[in-house]
């Protein structure tokens, strides 16, 4: 009996989603803020982040310590 109930509920959900989508597609919708400016806001935010991190990485003078090769000399081994 459980699979039968589960199948019936799935069909109800699919039909209600399809009806909702059909209902929404018939309505004329005016573009909202995200439709008008969403891509521009996303692009400007990405550009701002890239420019800021590029400046920080190249101009601020942070010592990143990427590789110690050539800068570190090994110590002599001491036998105790």
From Swiss-Prot:
Major subcellular site: mitochondrion
Main function: Component of the cytochrome c oxidase, the last enzyme in the mitochondrial electron transport chain which drives oxidative phosphorylation. The respiratory chain contains 3 multisubunit complexes succinate dehydrogenase (complex II, CII), ubiquinol-cytochrome c oxidoreductase (cytochrome b-c1 complex, complex III, CIII) and cytochrome c oxidase (complex IV, CIV), that cooperate to transfer electrons derived from NADH and succinate to molecular oxygen, creating an electrochemical gradient over the inner membrane that drives transmembrane transport and the ATP synthase.
Domain of life: Eukaryota
Targeting signal (transit peptide) range: 1-24
Keywords: Membrane, Mitochondrion, Mitochondrion inner membrane, Transit peptide, Transmembrane, Transmembrane helix
Mitochondrial intermembrane side: 60-80
InterPro entries attached to this UniProt entry: Cyt_c_oxidase_suVIIB (IPR008433), Cyt_c_oxidase_suVIIB_dom_sf (IPR023272)
Pathway entry: Energy metabolism; oxidative phosphorylation
Keyword Transmembrane helix: yes
PANTHER family the record matches: CYTOCHROME C OXIDASE SUBUNIT 7B, MITOCHONDRIAL
Compartment(s) where it occurs, according to its Swiss-Prot or TrEMBL record: Mitochondrion inner membrane
Record text on subunit structure and interactions: Component of the cytochrome c oxidase (complex IV, CIV), a multisubunit enzyme composed of 14 subunits. The complex is composed of a catalytic core of 3 subunits MT-CO1, MT-CO2 and MT-CO3, encoded in the mitochondrial DNA, and 11 supernumerary subunits COX4I, COX5A, COX5B, COX6A, COX6B, COX6C, COX7A, COX7B, COX7C, COX8 and NDUFA4, which are encoded in the nuclear genome.
Membrane topology: Single-pass membrane protein
Protein name: Cytochrome c oxidase subunit 7B, mitochondrial
Homology family: Belongs to the cytochrome c oxidase VIIb family.
Record GO biological process: central nervous system development; mitochondrial electron transport, cytochrome c to oxygen
Stretches of the chain found on the membrane's Mitochondrial matrix side: 25-32
Pfam families recorded: COX7B (PF05392)
Membrane spanning residue stretches: 33-59
Any GO CC annotation of this UniProt entry: respiratory chain complex IV
């Amino acid at each position: 009996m459980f699979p039968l109930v589960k199948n019936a509920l799935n069909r109800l959900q699919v039909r209600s989603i399809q009806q909702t989508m059909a209902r929404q597609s018939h309505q004329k919708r005016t573009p909202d803020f995200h439709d008008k400016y969403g891509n521009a806001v996303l692009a400007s935010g990405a550009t701002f982040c890239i420019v800021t991190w590029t400046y920080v990485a190249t101009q601020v003078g942070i010592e990143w310590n990427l590789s110690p090769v050539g800068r570190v000399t090994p110590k002599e081994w001491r036998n105790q």
